[in-house]
C-alpha cells in the first residue's frame, strides 16, 4: 500500500494470513489467483512485491468447488489438486437439513455465536501427537503399494479406470490420514485398516 505522506510502501496482509483458510468456489478463481494459492499451499509463504512472508502455524486450507460442468468454472491444475489431502463429495442435503439451511440463511434468525474450541497451540500439539503414532514398515510398504497400484501399467485391468495415477504426495497424505485415524481410534500404532478407511 502506498503512503502518499512520506512516499513509502507498506505491506497490508490480506485474509490468507490466517491459520485456517476457506477458499470458496476455488475453481471459479482465475489462473493467477490459483497460482498464488498454490504457492501458499506448497511453500507456506506468500510473496508480495518480491518479499516473502512465512505463514503462521498451523496453516490449513479448505476449499469448495463447483461441478466443472457449470458455467464460469476453470479446471484446477493437477499440481494444485495434489496439494489437498482429500476430496469429499457431498450429496444434496436431506429435507430437514435443507429446511434448517433455509431458516438460518433466509430467515431473520441471528447467526449463532462461534467460540474457539482450540488455540493454534492446541492444534500444533495435536499434530505432534498424531505424528508420533507408530507406523510399522509393513504398513508403510502397504501404503506405497496402494499408491503405486494407481499408476498406468501397475495392475492388469486397471487401464482406463483411473484418470491420473497418485503422486508420491498421495502416499504422504495417506500416511498422515492413517495416523490421524489411529489416533482418533485411541491407538498409538497404525494398521492397514486405518489406510483402507480413508
List where the protein language model places each region.
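Glycine/charge-rich, flexible interdomain linkers and switch-proximal surface loops
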Residues: 12-15, 56, 158-165
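Basic, amphipathic alpha-helical bundle interface domains used for macromolecular binding and assembly
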Residues: 106-198
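Canonical AAA+ ATPase core
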Residues: 4-6, 25, 29-33, 41-135, ...
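Short aromatic/hydrophobic contact patches that present stacked aromatics
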Residues: 20, 87, 163
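Conserved alpha-helical scaffold flanking the Walker A/P-loop in AAA+ ATPase domains
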Residues: 2-22
